[in-house]
């Protein structure tokens, strides 16, 4: 992002232990100058300064600012994980992205799943389960 507050940020996140505490409360964000366009597209229904960060040039309009210094990139990670869960399978792998978003993750997931040489199903049977994983589907798609 060209905005000085958002800019390029990096964060490594490992979900292997099922712990989302470092990203779960990160909010979506937008630039103030994009609000009319976003609303015009029928998006941001219910959006407010309580559930979204609004950035106006070099100022965050939310009274309390960011919840943490990594909130922008943490929300991008949270979005990516949520989009990947739409596959209906737990995916084991490594993802690296730059300015990711829903459309990019959707394209990645579609292309990945279309080519069966990219993945295979693996059963969790006989493997130690983490209690936090109980809400994930049983079959697992893995990188081949």
Language-model-derived ranges and their functions:
Residues 1-144:
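Short acidic-hydrophobic catalytic motif
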């Amino acid at each position: 992002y060209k905005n000085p507050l958002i800019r390029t940020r990096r964060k490594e996140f490992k979900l292997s232990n099922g712990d989302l505490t470092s990203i779960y409360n990160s909010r979506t964000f937008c630039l103030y100058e994009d609000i009319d366009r976003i609303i015009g597209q029928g998006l941001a229904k219910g959006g407010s300064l309580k559930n979204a960060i609004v950035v106006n040039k070099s100022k965050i309009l939310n009274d309390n600012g960011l919840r943490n210094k990594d909130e922008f990139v943490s929300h991008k990670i949270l979005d990516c994980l949520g989009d990947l869960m739409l596959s209906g399978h737990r995916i084991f792998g490594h993802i690296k992205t730059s300015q990711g978003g829903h459309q990019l993750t959707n394209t990645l997931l579609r292309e990945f799943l279309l080519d069966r040489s990219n993945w295979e199903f693996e059963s969790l049977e006989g493997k130690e389960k983490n209690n936090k994983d109980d809400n994930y589907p049983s079959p697992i798609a893995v990188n081949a």
